[in-house]
């Protein structure tokens, strides 16, 4: 009778030990699963973020920057300028009009409105290289060769400003399409700067 009790006690102890180990294993697995779940959640949240404040600022400010370039290009209509300058203005106007629509699409996709103050003369949000209302009025009043030289000089500064803005978002932005667009601005407007400098040299400006 005593031997039977001893055997039963040993059996109970063994069973209790097995249950304890199993419980610890389940707890560890649960903790690991919870940890993995949090990691996946964190990674998913990061993956969902495709743009940042630098991307938004760039697009909000580049839209009016481009719109001013289009406005300046339209000012050549009916003016007596060289064929090269006229062709350059036409290309700038067409290209940047398309790019404005593209950038407006980005803001709509992100659910972000265009900054109503961006690009306004005298405002802190005015894009780099943009002309003031007074400068545009002076350009409009110019005639002949003086107008062409002034237009090229202003567009040169305008392009340099756009490149500075583009380089900034390449360094700080995260949205792949915005970064690729900014890099294309650096290339295209860099080439146009070279062309403008050549035209100014020809005109003696």
Regions found by a protein language model. Give the residues of each.
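Core hydrophobic alpha-helical membrane-spanning segments
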Residues: 20-22
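All-alpha RGS (Regulator of G-protein Signaling) helical domain and cognate RGS-like helical scaffolds
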Residues: 30-205
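Bacterial N-terminal signal peptides that target proteins for export
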Residues: 4-17
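C-terminal motif of bacterial Sec signal peptides marking the signal peptidase cleavage site
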Residues: 24-28
């Amino acid at each position: 009778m005593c031997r039977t009790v001893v055997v039963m006690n040993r059996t109970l102890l063994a069973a209790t030990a097995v249950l304890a180990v199993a419980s610890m294993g389940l707890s560890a697995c649960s903790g690991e699963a919870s940890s993995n779940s949090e990691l996946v959640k964190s990674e998913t949240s990061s993956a969902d973020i495709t743009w940042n404040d630098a991307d938004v600022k760039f697009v909000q400010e580049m839209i009016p920057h481009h719109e001013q370039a289009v406005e300046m290009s339209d000012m050549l209509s009916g003016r007596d300028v060289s064929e090269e300058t006229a062709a350059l203005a036409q290309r700038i106007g067409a290209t940047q009009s398309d790019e404005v629509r593209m950038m407006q699409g980005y803001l709509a996709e992100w659910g972000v409105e265009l900054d109503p103050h961006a690009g306004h003369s005298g405002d802190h949000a005015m894009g780099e290289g943009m002309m003031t209302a007074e400068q545009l009025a002076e350009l409009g009043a110019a005639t002949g060769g003086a107008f062409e030289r002034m237009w090229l000089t202003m567009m040169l500064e305008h392009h340099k400003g756009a490149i500075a803005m583009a380089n900034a978002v390449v360094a700080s932005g995260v949205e792949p399409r915005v970064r690729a667009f900014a890099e294309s601005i650096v290339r295209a407007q860099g080439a146009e700067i070279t062309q403008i400098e050549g035209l100014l040299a020809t005109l003696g400006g």
